[in-house]
């Protein structure tokens, strides 16, 4: 984007040099790639008035001109331009002057006639041929308006200017316009931005009487509007407008087309102007193209369209390729009198695909691709109406013909001063922060310590709190952020943190139990994103995933661990024991960063012990997996409890939730037989723990106790109970009545079958008693044992 300083001053006034402005803009995030000075290498360039022109006596292609350059007498200049003529105001390089390329102007004789200066073309003063009006491509430049001879020609041409070239990143589409840049500059210098005039004197005639607009697919075209201007006069644009277009890299054509391009650069809103009489209908229908449909664009090329393309039609025939290029038969020509001005919002993806496929890149398509500001769509059309009325003698019809919805002009985001200060290291007051947002043109609402920032649609790069924090840092000044030393809760001298130590300890426990550590992808398929999830929350999906298998961020580590086990088993490695410590992700509200939680998961399948010498095998089972989990809890000095549960994807009768301090922190269970079969796995057991929750409870030290000086006692008890009663319920009853001498319990046998009623099972439990202060007696233990048995009988158990 090329930003003219002379043009920028129309919206914002600052007392600073262009070089300082460019430096400041670069420091705040928009790189100024180049600074173009149109006065560089130019000296003694003035406006001249050609008083007379005579043919050169000795050269057919040369003319001898008498030119008034504001001095006492006219000077004689020999000129070879085919379009030079008496009565013209022209650009003159005086004797002693300089032009780009090191050209020095001297007195000379051309075929015997003296020449005291040079009548210049735009190319000769450094303007690229690509941007010069076609009428001056092969001759000198002629002013379309009367000038004062002898005045500075660069000032008369509005080229006494410096232009900044922005190297924009895709997120800063707002700076693809003069107004967007003016907002940025106003914020940097804490000044006000003045918007241009948009109000026209309207006729009583309504555009609704001459035009209708219909959108067939609002997903691709959310909004389309049109205004009508009658009786325009096609002529060259004013010099100032032509100069601004040239400095922005656009060739001036005529006042109507130039106004369209001017407003595009001013607001960043692409417009299209149709010859109303050439449309051939009072209907404008916006639809997707028919497969194989053809149209000829403004570059005289016939295009074959696809259904993915969006076209503007007169109800039958395409008159424009939406957002990319107009059609040839409705273009503005010299005889055009009545204009229809289009202002619309088109789907960025559709515009990108169409422009890429047809190799049609334009100023309009590049802006539609990045997304445009809804707040400027109608305002830009109104601005074009005002300019057509002012510079093309147009008569503006009242009312706007539209279809669809513009959408929200603002996006509210809540933030606090504390959040900003903690993130950046500032100490700004709430008023300071609100002032910065107001400098940026963002309205704010304050409710206690919460600042609600109303972000305008032109700033599509601001969607979350962190974006607002960046804006505060940019405008306040990155260089002004105070240097501070990092603050730590606890400083360690080159040693592991408590969490690092405990994580390493857990890994050693699991590796010692025969499990291998795995590291899997954080991305899973959308179907697997919520599988085994302990929190039923919204998933985080990629907008453009590389494959369907990696389309969402995981909420569990198990889907990929199951894949890893299946992969190994398919390659004859049938005994698989893996664990992983990794992050899972849960979405928050729109504009909020997701929660990132560290989990610990494991999977075991096949044989746990293979003794080839004796031929004995121990197959992985629930209790083996539970033993691994219990070993983790012991190492972290935690106490888990288990509660029967039903979890999708796990065996309904062999699954339990893992509780810590009465809160669910994980689960353990056998993989559902159907899921196991789908992955060619035999009986497979998995567990998953919220590792962050464990770390939050686990203390960073181990409590040591003396070795008991007195012997303990063990009693076994066999209970016949209903098969649906979990052992955990029985153990809970035992511990509730065991007093302070019952140290632990162990289920060592479960039996169902012969000699038991149907629906019953026998559970054998060992109870270990110990008193650390004195030797236990049989009488004391028996008394406690009797209380326990009575409680179990009351629970429905039969003592065997």
Curated annotation (Swiss-Prot):
Residues 39-154 form the tRNA-binding domain. Mg(2+) binds at residues 461, 467, 470-471. Residues 708-800 form the FDX-ACB domain. The keyword Membrane does not apply. Its EC number is 6.1.1.20. GO terms for molecular function: ATP binding; catalytic activity, acting on a protein; magnesium ion binding; phenylalanine-tRNA ligase activity; transferase activity; tRNA binding. One of its GO terms (cellular component) is phenylalanine-tRNA ligase complex. It is found in: Cytoplasm. It catalyses: tRNA(Phe) + L-phenylalanine + ATP = L-phenylalanyl-tRNA(Phe) + AMP + diphosphate + H(+). Keywords: Aminoacyl-tRNA synthetase, ATP-binding, Cytoplasm, Ligase, Magnesium, Metal-binding, Nucleotide-binding, Protein biosynthesis, RNA-binding, tRNA-binding. Its main location: cytoplasm. Its cofactor is Mg(2+). Pfam families: B3_4, B5, FDX-ACB, tRNA_bind, tRNA_synthFbeta. It comes from the Bacteria. Binds 2 magnesium ions per tetramer. InterPro entries: aa-tRNA-synth_II/BPL/LPL, B3/B4_tRNA-bd, DNA-bd_dom_put_sf, Fdx_antiC-bd, Fdx_antiC-bd_sf, NA-bd_OB-fold, Phe-tRNA-ligase_IIc_bsu, Phe-tRNA-ligase_IIc_bsu_bact. The keyword Transcription does not apply. GO terms for biological process: phenylalanyl-tRNA aminoacylation. Tetramer of two alpha and two beta subunits. NCBIfam families: pheT_bact (TIGR00472), YtpR (NF045760). This is Phenylalanine--tRNA ligase beta subunit.
């Amino acid at each position: 984007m090329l930003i003219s300083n002379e043009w920028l001053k129309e919206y914002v006034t600052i007392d600073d040099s262009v070089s300082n402005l460019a430096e400041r803009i670069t420091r705040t995030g928009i790189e100024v790639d180049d600074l173009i000075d149109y006065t560089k290498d130019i000296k003694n360039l003035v406006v001249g008035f050609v008083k007379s022109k005579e043919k050169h006596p000795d050269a057919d292609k040369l003319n001898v001109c008498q030119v008034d350059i504001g001095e006492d007498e006219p000077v004689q200049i020999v000129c070879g331009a085919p379009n030079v003529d008496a009565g013209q105001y022209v650009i003159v390089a005086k004797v002693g002057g300089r032009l780009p390329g090191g050209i020095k102007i001297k007195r000379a004789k051309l075929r015997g006639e003296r020449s005291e200066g040079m009548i210049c073309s735009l190319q000769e003063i450094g303007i690229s041929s690509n941007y010069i009006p076609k009428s001056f491509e092969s001759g000198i430049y002629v002013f379309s308006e009367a000038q004062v001879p002898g005045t500075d020609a660069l000032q008369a041409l509005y080229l006494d200017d410096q232009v900044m070239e922005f190297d924009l990143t895709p997120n800063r589409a707002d700076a693809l316009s003069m107004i967007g840049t003016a907002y940025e500059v106003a914020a940097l210098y804490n000044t006000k931005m003045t918007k241009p005039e948009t109000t026209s004197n309207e006729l009583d005639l309504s555009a609704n009487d001459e035009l209708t607009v219909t959108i067939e697919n609002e997903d691709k075209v959310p909004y389309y509007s049109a205004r009508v201007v009658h009786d325009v006069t096609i002529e060259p644009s004013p010099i100032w407008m032509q100069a601004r277009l040239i400095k922005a890299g656009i060739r001036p054509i005529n006042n109507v087309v130039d106004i369209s391009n001017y407003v595009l650069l001013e607001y960043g809103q692409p417009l299209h102007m149709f010859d109303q009489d050439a449309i051939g209908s009072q209907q404008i229908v916006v639809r997707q193209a028919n497969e194989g449909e053809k149209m000829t664009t403004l570059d005289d090329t016939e295009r074959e369209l696809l259904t993915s393309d969006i076209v503007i039609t007169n109800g039958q025939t395409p008159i424009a390729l939406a957002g990319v290029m107009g059609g040839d038969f409705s273009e503005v020509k010299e005889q055009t009198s009545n204009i229809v001005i289009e202002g619309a919002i088109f789907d960025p993806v559709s515009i990108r695909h169409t422009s890429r496929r047809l190799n049609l890149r334009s100023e309009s398509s590049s802006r539609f691709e990045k997304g445009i500001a809804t707040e400027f769509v109608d305002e830009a059309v109104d601005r074009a109406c005002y300019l057509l009325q002012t510079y093309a003698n147009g008569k503006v019809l009242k009312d706007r013909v539209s279809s669809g919805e513009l959408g929200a002009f603002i996006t509210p985001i809540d933030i606090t001063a504390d959040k900003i200060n903690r993130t950046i290291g500032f100490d700004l007051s709430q008023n300071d922060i609100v002032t910065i947002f107001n400098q940026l043109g963002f309205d704010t609402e304050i409710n206690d310590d919460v600042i609600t920032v109303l972000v305008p649609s032109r700033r599509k790069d601001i969607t979350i709190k962190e974006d607002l924090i960046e804006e505060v840092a940019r405008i306040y000044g990155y260089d002004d952020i105070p240097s501070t030393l990092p603050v730590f809760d606890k400083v360690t001298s080159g040693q592991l943190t408590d969490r690092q130590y405990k994580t390493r300890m857990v890994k050693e426990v699991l590796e010692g139990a025969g499990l291998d550590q795995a590291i899997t992808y954080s991305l899973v398929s959308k179907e697997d994103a919520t599988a085994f999830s302990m929190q039923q929350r919204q998933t985080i999906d990629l907008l453009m995933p590389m494959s369907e298998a990696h389309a969402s961020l995981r909420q569990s580590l198990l889907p990929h661990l199951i894949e890893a086990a299946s992969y190994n088993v398919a390659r004859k490695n049938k005994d698989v024991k893996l664990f992983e410590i990794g992050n899972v992700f849960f979405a928050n509200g729109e504009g909020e960063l997701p929660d990132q939680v560290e989990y610990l998961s494991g999977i075991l399948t096949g044989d746990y012990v293979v003794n080839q010498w004796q031929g004995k095998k121990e197959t992985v089972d629930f209790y083996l997996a539970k033993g691994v989990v219990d070993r983790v809890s012991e190492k972290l000095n935690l106490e888990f409890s288990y509660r029967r549960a039903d979890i999708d994807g796990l065996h309904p009768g062999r699954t339990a939730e893992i509780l810590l301090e009465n809160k669910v922190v994980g689960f353990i269970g056998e993989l559902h037989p159907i899921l196991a079969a789908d992955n060619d796995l035999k009986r497979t057991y998995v567990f998953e723990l919220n590792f962050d929750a464990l770390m939050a409870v686990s203390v960073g030290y181990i409590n040591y106790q003396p070795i008991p000086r007195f012997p303990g006692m063990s009693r076994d008890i066999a209970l016949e109970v209903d098969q649906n009663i979990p052992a955990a319920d029985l153990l809970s009853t035992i511990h509730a009545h065991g007093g302070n001498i019952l140290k632990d319990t162990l289920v060592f046998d479960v039996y169902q079958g012969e000699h038991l009623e149907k629906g019953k099972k026998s559970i054998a439990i060992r109870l270990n008693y110990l008193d650390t202060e004195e030797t236990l007696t049989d009488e004391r233990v028996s008394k406690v044992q009797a209380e326990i048995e009575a409680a179990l009988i009351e629970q429905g158990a039969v003592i065997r």
